[in-house]
Amino acid sequence: MSNIQLWMTPKRDMTVFFPLLHIIILTGMNTQDFASAYFGMLGDWRLMHWLIIGIHCVVLLFLTTCIQHFRFIFLPLYGIDWTSMALWAALLMQLAYLLDYADWYSWFNHSTVWYLMGTILITLSAILHRMMHVRHPYINPRVFSGFRYVKHILLLVCLFEWLFATEHILEEIFLEEVMHYSTITNAAFSLPVWTGNVAGCIFSLWWLQKVMRMSYIRLGIVGSLMLFAYLVMMYLMVSPSLSIEMLYLPLFCRGFAYTTLSIVFMASLHDVMDFNHFFQGLSVFNMIHMVIGGCMGCALY
């Protein structure tokens, strides 16, 4: 996506790039869920693997035949803190395991949880030590303390990920265990979610470019209201007599809210940080967005 960024926006306007980026990513994610379910119904689940292999072969064939072979000057990867990178990865795996399986272990009534907490503290201490004493750490401490609003943005990301955990707890348990919907029926729900994703991207692009340029707070309020509407509908509409059609609107609201809030947080982070630290801040953002926030929300529920 970075290679074709200038095709999308020659001025590198992130309020244009981020909405278009989310359309491509979320379309692929929803299509994958839909395709894997139907391949499993029509034939064999291995067909999805063959499809992915075929797509990769087409991409490699295109790169071989249509792209000019050109390389920039070789730059050695000196000065990268590989040890801290491994420690951050280990910390994420430890936190994900703790938050996912602590309930199965009955939390602090089992010795495994206490051992895991001890290893998490050791890993975190090693990360903080290297962050303060290594010349070029993997995540610079200035990411958290050198820019205004970064900590507020990361805290809001974590909070909203907790709220989105309803999708994994209430929605999935209700649809699978109470309503006993099949895999195909659950896969069909990807369509209203995808529609909400695309609508959220187009609305965010229109809002930031035409209505109130750079007005992230108001756009964030719109996304928050859509998330609140999804949560209220999912809590109040839960009933064994619920029809499938009644689920389309809350699922649309979830897709719209997820996309809008993601664009707001990424664009806000880009504006408050300089180029040298933005990708480190983006790494922390994705750690919370993709791993810690959702796992913590599920654990709290």
Task: Locate the predicted segments by residue.
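Transmembrane-helix bundle of Major Facilitator Superfamily
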Residues: 1-60, 247-253
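Cytoplasmic-side transmembrane-helix entry/capping segments in multi-pass membrane proteins
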Residues: 13-24, 77-86, 143-145, 216-222
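Alpha-helical transmembrane segments of multi-pass secondary-active solute transporters
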Residues: 17, 47-52, 112-116, 186, ...
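Structural signature of transmembrane alpha-helices in multi-pass secondary transporters
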Residues: 17-29, 84, 88, 160, ...
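Interfacial helix-cap and linker-helix signal at transmembrane-aqueous boundaries
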Residues: 34-44, 99, 175-176, 207-208, ...
